[in-house]
Amino acid sequence: HKGAAGIVYCRSRKRVEDVAAALQAEGIPALAYHAGMPSDQRDAIQDRFIAEDGLVMCATIAFGMGVDKPDIRFVCHHDLPGSIESYYQEIGRAGRDGDPAEALLLYGTDDIKLRRELIETSEKAPEQKRIEHQRLNQLLALVETPDCRRQALLAYFGERLGEPCGNCDRCLTPVERQDGSVAAQKFLSAMVRT
């Protein structure tokens, strides 16, 4: 997406600053935006992003509400989003002009572990922790689905897409499925015998 407008969402202010600096070091015109900045500075950065072509906005979730820039070609989540609802809203900022756009979500097992630890060590009530774990599990089920991502996303919101979309990574490069039942039976049989 060289020369295209995009948004990179990060969960922390420090990560926003680090990612923007890394992109700038690679010659990519990137801006940083987070709630720790004075409001006049945030307004100026947002206005610049809307007015200029080809800028990449590195931001926390503080950015995006009320942003009307139709030619955003990509939205990248540098960290796991807070929820499926947040993810849906944030990726919806790309391609509003009707031209092709992409969404990319970067995460690893350490991100999942950290999120679970943050939930467990929070001072929230046990029921709220259970709900947050459930929301994280739903998000992980979506991002790890071997099936059409658009179908999975719409199904979460109670909508149906009759056919796979044909555009997501799962449709364009299907996951190779393997029947593991024979291997599982052999494993269980070996366990019973030992």
Residue ranges and their predicted role:
Residues 31, 115, 121-194:
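C-terminal accessory/connector segments of nucleic-acid motor ATPases
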Residues 1-124, 131-134, 161, 169:
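Helicase motor core with emphasis on the C-terminal RecA-like subdomain
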